[in-house]
């Protein structure tokens, strides 16, 4: 098995820590909030407020399940538009009260069902991209599994984008890439090599800003490393004026 195939397998592993795991382990007194105030709650997106070293932080994440029933409840981590609208509601609330935002991303992509399209999936994603680009508080986005397509990017327009070591971030799945390019989904491993989807490759290209090591570390050590990195980064970002924060975010994405 090639290195990229191993990483792809680990990124999709059902036993990986979820967004909710990180929210509860990293932040004190995490309180989950629900609903988009428009249609319904979406179990594929979690969000709420917690404290980090005494500072209030808004946490948003895309949640996969740990077993079949949980995955059915979470729609296998594929958000509907109401999930993205819930996320945006919480981020705008964070802006109102001056709370930084941390997002945890693990999704193969936004849900492509008929109902989701009828309720404006494309609009919901596009609005998140627009609003996050101008959100007047610090944002840190962390890929914790799969970072698939616009469904992942809708929570990743951030001042800093990080990845865990054994995760992926791509425009679409390797299977989808192979099907489109070669009409053969079985060539997914070959596609993954071409796509440059691993954390190391994306760090080298400047797409992500930090890779958090996983191999050889206990779960508790990984959680502590993420917590420390968030504390340090928020301390730096909080020193910037709103104008400088937004300009740096703008330039970060303009360079692509």
UniProtKB/Swiss-Prot annotation:
Residues 1-236 form the CoA carboxyltransferase C-terminal domain. The keyword Lipid metabolism applies. GO terms for molecular function: acetyl-CoA carboxylase activity; ATP binding; carboxyl- or carbamoyltransferase activity. Pathway: Lipid metabolism; malonyl-CoA biosynthesis; malonyl-CoA from acetyl-CoA: step 1/1. It is found in: Cytoplasm. Its EC number is 2.1.3.15. It catalyses: N(6)-carboxybiotinyl-L-lysyl-[protein] + acetyl-CoA = N(6)-biotinyl-L-lysyl-[protein] + malonyl-CoA. PROSITE patterns: COA_CT_CTER. GO terms for biological process: fatty acid biosynthetic process; malonyl-CoA biosynthetic process. Pfam families: ACCA. The keyword Nucleotide-binding applies. Keywords: ATP-binding, Cytoplasm, Fatty acid biosynthesis, Fatty acid metabolism, Lipid biosynthesis, Lipid metabolism, Nucleotide-binding, Transferase. Acetyl-CoA carboxylase is a heterohexamer composed of biotin carboxyl carrier protein (AccB), biotin carboxylase (AccC) and two subunits each of ACCase subunit alpha (AccA) and ACCase subunit beta (AccD). Component of the acetyl coenzyme A carboxylase (ACC) complex. First, biotin carboxylase catalyzes the carboxylation of biotin on its carrier protein (BCCP) and then the CO(2) group is transferred by the carboxyltransferase to acetyl-CoA to form malonyl-CoA. NCBIfam families: accA, AccA_sub, PRK05724.1, PRK12319.1. Belongs to the AccA family. This is Acetyl-coenzyme A carboxylase carboxyl transferase subunit alpha. It comes from Streptococcus thermophilus (strain ATCC BAA-491 / LMD-9).
